[in-house]
């Protein structure tokens, strides 16, 4: 039996530093819209034009960020242009989180996380968009997940970075309330995004985002968004039972790529989410030497993974890319017979836990297996 080979990706350069940090927050060739919904006005930024019947890539940022600070470093990355030439991009800013947003009036009731998800259908209708491939980070990943659960016909695929499918426990809630009395909101947000190792080691990145959160985001509005996220409900998703009709289980129906850095505070939450999703259409990407913002510090790896993801959905089949080191984790009940790919691959078995790992051609998607990727 062949030995499993790992191939390392060469692009591991952080995008943010003192010279180009500001540039990577900038928008290029964009159109901005303020769209009225039943739950308030939402700010949307469009890059490019929709391509025929193709879905639009729709992004949703995390707390303490907006679309610029969360995604522009990723979408301005050179290799991403191979993707954006085939897809329009729609960036959604949560209410009051966009650059230069005024404070909400006293007594304003900020939308719940469920209501934020329900603001998206009017956005698609207003822009005449038929379907999306969503990319969400943290709170944005939760919102897009809720949107996909409520409107599966509008979502073709999801890339969920640092997603937490669980409601905030009462102990966590009490701790956050207590910390809020002694800690400013900027420190709370930084602890949400970055682990202790990254907070101490990546000082330039932390300082860039500390200044952005404190100076570019309306602090009153940020507190409202943070409170909404802390009050989220459990997504109540569950892994389908083998042999059961998928329509009887509450789970994401679309192709889903879960992403988390190995030093991220969200690792446990993402692993929990993976355990609840359908292994047939879910991939878990764990990024080595990476913290809470993989789209910023490891754009090359994430871009390549996103290309594979789109290829698996039948888009951009001619995209040029290097080989990605991958390993699959199979359940013992999975069959390698009828679902076996015609492409060659090597498989190694772990007798102690009954799992198998494989390395295969990047354009192969075995729909009967759960895939776990490490890079």
From Swiss-Prot:
Positions with biased composition (Low complexity): 330-346
Biased composition (Basic and acidic residues): 364-375
Keywords: Acetylation, Phosphoprotein
Residues modified as N-acetylmethionine: 1
Keyword Phosphoprotein attached: yes
Compositionally biased intervals (Polar residues): 347-359
A Pfam family hit: Ndr
SUPFAM superfamilies referenced in this protein's UniProt entry, alphabetically: alpha/beta-Hydrolases (SSF53474)
Family indicated by similarity: Belongs to the NDRG family.
Residue numbers of Phosphoserine PTMs: 331, 334-335, 338, 341, 352, 361, 374
Modified residues (Phosphothreonine): 322, 329, 332, 355
Cross-referenced InterPro entries: AB_hydrolase_fold (IPR029058), NDRG (IPR004142)
Organism: Homo sapiens (Human)
GO BP annotations listed: cell differentiation; negative regulation of cell growth; signal transduction; spermatogenesis
Chain positions covered by the region annotation Disordered: 326-375
Top-rank taxon, per record: Eukaryota
Tissue spec: Ubiquitous. Highly expressed in brain.
PANTHER family reported in the protein's UniProt record: N-MYC DOWNSTREAM REGULATED (PTHR11034)
Example of a GO cellular component annotation carried by this entry: extracellular exosome
Protein name in UniProt: Protein NDRG3
């Amino acid at each position: 039996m062949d030995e499993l080979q790992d191939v390392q990706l060469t692009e591991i350069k952080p995008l943010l530093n003192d010279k180009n940090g500001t540039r990577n927050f900038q928008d290029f060739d964009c159109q901005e819209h303020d769209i009225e919904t039943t739950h308030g006005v939402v700010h949307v930024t469009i890059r490019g034009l929709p391509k025929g019947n193709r879905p639009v890539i729709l992004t949703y940022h995390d707390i303490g960020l907006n679309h610029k600070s969360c995604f522009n470093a990723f979408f301005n990355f050179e290799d991403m242009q191979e993707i954006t030439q085939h897809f329009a991009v729609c960036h959604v800013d949560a209410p009051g989180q966009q650059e230069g947003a005024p404070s909400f009036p006293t007594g304003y009731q900020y939308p719940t996380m469920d209501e934020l998800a329900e603001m998206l259908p009017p956005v698609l209708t207003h822009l005449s968009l038929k379907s999306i491939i969503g990319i969400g980070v943290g709170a944005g990943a939760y919102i897009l997940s809720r949107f996909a659960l409520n409107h599966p016909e509008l979502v073709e695929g999801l890339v969920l970075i640092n997603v937490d499918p669980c409601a905030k426990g009462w102990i966590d809630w009490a701790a956050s309330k207590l910390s809020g009395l002694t800690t400013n909101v900027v420190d709370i947000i930084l602890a949400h995004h970055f682990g202790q190792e990254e907070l101490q080691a990546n000082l330039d990145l932390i300082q860039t985002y500390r200044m952005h959160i404190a100076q570019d985001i309306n602090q009153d509005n940020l507190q409202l968004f943070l409170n909404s996220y802390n009050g989220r409900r459990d997504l109540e998703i569950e892994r389908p039972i083998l042999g059961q009709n998928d329509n009887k289980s509450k789970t994401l129906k679309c192709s889903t790529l879960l992403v988390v850095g190995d030093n991220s505070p969200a690792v446990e939450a993402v692993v929990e989410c993976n355990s609840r999703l359908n292994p047939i259409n879910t991939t878990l990407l764990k990024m080595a030497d990476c913290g809470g913002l993989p789209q910023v510090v490891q754009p090359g790896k994430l871009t390549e993974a996103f290309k594979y993801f789109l290829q698996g959905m039948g888009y951009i089949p001619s995209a040029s890319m290097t080989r990605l080191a991958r390993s699959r984790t199979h359940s013992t009940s999975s069959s390698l017979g009828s679902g076996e790919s015609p492409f060659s691959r090597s498989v190694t078995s772990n007798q102690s836990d009954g799992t198998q790992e494989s390395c295969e051609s990047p354009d192969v998607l075995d729909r009967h297996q759960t895939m776990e990727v490490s890079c």
